């Protein structure tokens, strides 16, 4: 009698390519062959397509975005998006990614959870005391020690008071840190176990300097201020956001007040040193109003295709539905828009998008057990 382990490898690979990222843990238990092929499939695909997570209306969605057929309309694969059901009963407020693990922070005083989407394991993070209960104003960073990959969570407890503590996943223990970056920290991303933040000087406009600052989870300290390839004026019409490039480089998007969008990528980055290269510069005033009119953007880049895929932080609407749009932007004014994540405008959904909960994070699967 034939079994599923007898199926041709090419057929199994085709099946696995259609399985949502969060369902692969069930596939892995099917048989040894499927387990091995799922690892090859998923780790190989991360080099060919964008795998990531997007947060919309306090829900988490896995997303696949393949640019392989970009130059040939008939071969272009539309992005797929699927809601993550494992966390459906809780409203997710923030998500932080570090090399295959997700730190999910919920609305209210619920404990955060670290989740491995590939293996399916979870670990809940208990506060040290009632005084340390989680607040909406708390900020987080997620990283690990260099030598043993011991994962840690940094929290800015009521960050405007300059109170910082750190959680060690191995020992399940919190401790207070005597650190002070002496700056206004905005957004951050994890790269090679460290977290790099876009930050501004605590000073009055218009002489506010902006820069990067790194938190090293091995030393448990903030590093020196690192230069950016631009200077933002701090105007409401400006926007700065960070993104990782295959967990190897850092990219920064800067939208100027005059509508010019610039994207830079690091050629070298360490806690005390950074070098930048210009990746893309476009004038958004020549683009459709629905894109130009959006102030905030989230993005990832494809170095091989030399394009940026940019998402607005709010949906677009029709009489019947709402949907998200990805804009593929290249040099010479190249622009392609792709719709996905359609939601009907009925009483059940009630136009349920929430622009404050939009998040985009690339994903590389992890074999870390929780």
UniProtKB/Swiss-Prot annotation:
SUPFAM superfamilies: F-box domain. Disulfide bonds: none annotated. Residues 1-46 form the F-box domain. NCBIfam families: F_box_assoc_1. This is F-box protein At1g66490. It comes from Arabidopsis thaliana.
